[in-house]
């Protein structure tokens, strides 16, 4: 929710958006959009994310776009595995791919709570170089997940454990890949 409220706190010449997956129920989707857009932010449907970010860049519009990757990718969306909390874990790579395509600077923000309704978000640069200049062996995605793990260990009450990051195993994924190639 903090991404949706950023326009309330920062300069009006900076657009703020968050990536979201439209809900199947149109009434709930409308309600969700109304609540998330009430402070002036923009909900960007996942399927049009790259197009919208390219449009913002083309028009030289400064923007902060929130990518949240707290869930497990579907089988057909798994393109990368990384070590996360001592387990091989499938992860989304959209932030890295889009960041490279549009020359974006990418930050990571920890979510912690000082007291009721106060959530300081210390933003940290993941890499000092734009992501496209990072050596191949140093994937942005692999730099991001250890930070989440550290934050989860320090503040487990803020992580959505219900999302079950490990419901998809690498062995099952490899088996499915082999079946598809037959």
What are these regions (language model features)?
Residues 4-8, 28-32, 77-80:
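A short secondary-structure junction signal
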């Amino acid at each position: 929710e903090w991404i949706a409220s950023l326009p309330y706190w920062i300069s009006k010449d900076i657009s703020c958006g968050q990536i979201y997956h439209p809900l199947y129920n149109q009434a709930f989707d409308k309600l969700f959009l109304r609540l998330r857009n009430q402070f002036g932010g923009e909900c960007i449907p996942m399927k049009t994310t790259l197009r919208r970010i390219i449009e913002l860049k083309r028009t030289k519009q400064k923007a902060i776009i929130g990518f949240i990757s707290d869930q497990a990718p579907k089988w057909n969306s798994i393109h990368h595995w990384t070590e996360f909390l001592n387990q091989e874990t499938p992860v989304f790579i959209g932030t890295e791919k889009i960041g490279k395509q549009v020359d974006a600077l990418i930050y990571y923000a920890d979510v912690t709570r000082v007291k009721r309704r106060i959530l300081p978000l210390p933003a940290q640069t993941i890499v000092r170089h734009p992501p496209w200049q990072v050596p191949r062996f140093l994937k942005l995605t692999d730099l991001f997940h250890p930070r989440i793990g550290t934050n989860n260990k320090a503040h487990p009450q803020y992580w959505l454990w219900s999302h079950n990051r490990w419901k998809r195993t690498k062995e099952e994924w490899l088996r499915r890949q082999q079946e598809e190639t037959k």
